[in-house]
Amino acid sequence: VLAATNYDLDGSVSGKKRRIDPALLRRFDNRIYVDLPNEEERKQYLELKLNQKGKNKISEDIISNLAARTTGQSIAILQNVIELAMRNAAKAGTELSGERLLDALEEYNYGEKKTWEQGYYESVAIHESGHAYAAWCAGEKPSYVTIVSRGNFGGYMQHENSENKPNYSREDLLGKIRTSLAGRAAEKVFFGREASLNTGASSDLRSATDMAMRVIATYGMDEENLVCLSPEQILNTTLAKEFIERTNRLLKEQMKETENLICSGREKVEALAKKLLEQNHLTQNEIQDIFDET
């Protein structure tokens, strides 16, 4: 019997509702696990598919960027992105371009573009440039940054994938916290405290809080604690108040460092934001060029 499935064999990832019946599994003599493609394999597929369609004029930079930004995605998704880009190009009566491919990946993952007033884009450009600069300073090269609004976000920064990194140090995780806090920190540095207090940083604060709590309670990286507990477990114990206070203390310390970081790199953040307002999005090489030249 030969078969293929995307379902979990034991339900450990998706839960028992997606588990294959053990009675069926017993009929197979052998099981072959096929992982999702890594970055190099995604790049090879994109090159092959575009060449097959006669679209071999797409730049190496665009193909590498798409491959780097699709960690954890299947070949089928990459094919869907290419097809979407080609349909959009046909509707517009233009040739398939790198810009169309980048836009198609955004549309496939997050939906149609939304339009807002200019003042909003200026704020988002500073916010996302802050994220990109903090990630760059932490050694996680930003691979893409955009101020185009889709879904439930106004823009976003995506850093270089970490497929080949087996573990993280405490400083690595603090760098991630600073990167999450850098959007609000940049708005505060450029526009003042009151203007920075908006709902745009809510998901960033959730991410920073979760990471800070894991540094303190889960990964054994706090001087006062070696107990390994998840954030959910902590909140259900008598230690909740203590851990929340320590988490908040760590976040405040990192926010102060992040504000200092943005102040010291103000010219780079401003230059990146200016370019974002001109182009709406930037790839890794474009971001690196701006930071190198400023």
What does each model-identified segment do?
Residues V1-V34, E40-K43:
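Canonical AAA+ ATPase core
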Residues T115, Y120-I126, A132-T294:
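Soluble catalytic regions of large protease machineries
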Residues T5, F28, R42, S74, ...:
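Conserved RecA-like P-loop NTPase ATPase core
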Residues P22-R26, S59-D61, K114:
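Short, flexible turn/loop "capping" segments at secondary-structure junctions
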Residues V34-R100, G183-K188, G192, T218-C228:
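Conserved C-terminal "switch" segment of AAA+ ATPases
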Residues N6-G11, L36-R42, Q52, Q73, ...:
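Conserved nucleotide-binding/hydrolysis micro-motifs of P-loop NTPases
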Residues R19, A23-R27, Y45-K49, V81-L84, ...:
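Alpha-helical scaffold elements adjacent to nucleotide-binding pockets in ATP/GTP-utilizing enzyme cores
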Residues E107-Y108:
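Terminal C-lobe "cap" of eukaryotic-type protein kinase domains
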